Protein backbone atom coordinates (compact mmCIF):
# COMPACT_ATOMS: atom_id res chain seq x y z
CA UNK A 1 0.00 0.00 0.00
CA UNK A 2 1.05 3.62 0.38
CA UNK A 3 0.20 4.52 3.98
CA UNK A 4 2.85 2.46 5.75
CA UNK A 5 6.42 1.54 4.94
CA UNK A 6 5.80 -2.09 5.84
CA UNK A 7 3.64 -3.95 3.31
CA UNK A 8 1.04 -6.11 5.06
CA UNK A 9 0.76 -3.80 8.05
CA UNK A 10 -2.65 -3.34 9.69
CA UNK A 11 -2.87 0.20 8.32
CA UNK A 12 -1.72 -0.90 4.87
CA UNK A 13 -3.86 -4.00 5.06
CA UNK A 14 -7.25 -2.28 4.78
CA UNK A 15 -6.29 -0.58 1.54
CA UNK A 16 -4.58 -3.58 -0.07
CA UNK A 17 -6.78 -6.43 1.14
From Swiss-Prot:
GO terms for biological process: neuropeptide signaling pathway. Keywords: Neuropeptide. It comes from the Eukaryota. One of its GO terms (cellular component) is extracellular region. GO terms for molecular function: neuropeptide hormone activity. This is Peptide hormone 3. It comes from Periplaneta americana.
Amino acid sequence: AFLTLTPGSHVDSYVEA
